């Protein structure tokens, strides 16, 4: 009896030691993977900063976040200035896209042909007018003449609906409550933005990469809505395009030239002072990653983003 008890105790202790060892090895492996990914992001940043040093590209004008999704259950993330708040241009439309599908899934809004058309144009064509309509639907607010202070306060609370949604999910350091315009905002839209733009949209590459990774792994919304979003984000980077700002050919897709069996999903954004891309890439060898690159004050430098992407792709191939 005593021998049986002793044997059982030895087995239990051995099992605990083995499990502890496996856990420690797993932690060490994850730590090594994270360190390796951080080195890769640092290398990509250095490559861009060195290549464009003569164009006066500085660290303060570049932000990068990379999420390795080769093991989707245990993604690894690394950033270079990933928590810096940057005006996102049309990349903010990615956040409105997810919000629309969440609202639809929760039956807060109804899908109409007009909403479906607007969402498609917002993502595929990056239409600002479509985005304005989408944000109206999401927040039940509209632009127009200035409002009295009390009414404007109520209007602004409603307009912050998308902000509240992402805040509840743990997103921090972002602001997603403004429409995108080809020229400028007027009336209550301008009042909302603030006289000095203090309430402009702001995103970080970390928040953007997190959202895109949740889209591609099906965690943002249900599978049906995830599939619809991925269809809109799919980009063709093969061949050439007459449009330098084509989302497939003018950003991360440049780095995929010659890799016809690779796949790209993305949302780019650009203005006279910014050039950004949020991309999800699948390589022929099975590597999968999200790469978000924001650049400021170098909007006409089409090669900064692909320079970053090439370093990542070469390491992942």
Where do the model's predicted regions map?
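N-terminal leader/targeting segments and the immediately adjacent pre-domain N-terminus
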Residues: 2-5, 11-81, 104-109, 152, ...
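Structured C-terminal helix/loop/strand segments within mature extracytoplasmic catalytic/sensor domains
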Residues: 23-48, 56-58, 159, 200, ...
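Active-site-adjacent helix/loop patches that line small-molecule binding or acyl-intermediate pockets
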Residues: 29-47, 59, 114-193, 201-206
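Extracytoplasmic
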Residues: 57-62, 75, 81-83, 87-91, ...
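Active-site-proximal beta-strand/loop segments in catalytic clefts of secreted hydrolases
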Residues: 67-70, 123-126, 134-138, 178-180, ...
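Active-site SXXK
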Residues: 87-109, 122, 291
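Short glycine/serine- and small hydrophobic-enriched flexible loop segments
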Residues: 98-106, 136, 210-217, 314
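Short, well-structured active-site flanking segments
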Residues: 102-120, 131, 222-226
């Amino acid at each position: 009896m005593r021998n049986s008890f002793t044997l059982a105790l030895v087995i239990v202790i051995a099992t605990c030691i083995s499990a502890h060892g496996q856990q420690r090895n797993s932690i060490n492996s994850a730590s090594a993977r994270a360190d390796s990914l951080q080195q890769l992001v640092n290398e990509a940043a250095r490559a861009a900063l060195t290549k464009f040093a003569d164009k006066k590209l500085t660290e303060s004008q570049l932000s990068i976040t990379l999420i390795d999704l080769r093991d989707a259950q245990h993604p690894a993330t690394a950033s270079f200035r990933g928590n810096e708040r940057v005006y996102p241009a049309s990349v903010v439309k990615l956040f409105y896209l997810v919000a629309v599908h969440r609202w639809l899934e929760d039956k807060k809004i109804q899908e109409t042909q007009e909403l479906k058309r607007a969402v498609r144009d917002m993502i595929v064509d990056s239409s600002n007018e479509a985005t304005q309509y989408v944000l109206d639907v999401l927040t039940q607010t509209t632009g127009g003449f200035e409002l009295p202070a009390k009414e404007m306060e109520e209007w602004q609370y409603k307009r912050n609906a998308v902000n509240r949604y992402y805040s509840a999910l743990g997103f921090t350091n972002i602001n997603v409550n403004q429409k995108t315009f080809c020229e400028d905002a007027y009336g209550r839209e301008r009042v909302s933005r603030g006289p000095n733009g203090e309430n402009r949209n702001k995103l970080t590459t970390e928040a953007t990469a997190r959202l895109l990774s949740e889209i591609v792994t099906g965690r943002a919304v249900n599978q049906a809505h995830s599939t619809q979003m991925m269809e809109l984000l799919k980009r063709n980077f093969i061949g050439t395009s007459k449009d330098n700002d084509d989302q497939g050919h003018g950003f991360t897709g440049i780095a995929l030239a010659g890799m016809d069996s690779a796949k790209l999903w993305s949302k780019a954004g650009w203005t006279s002072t910014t050039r950004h891309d949020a991309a999800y890439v699948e390589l022929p060898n099975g590597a999968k990653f999200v790469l978000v690159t924001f650049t400021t004050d170098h909007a006409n430098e089409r090669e900064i983003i692909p320079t970053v992407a090439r370093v990542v792709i070469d390491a992942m191939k």
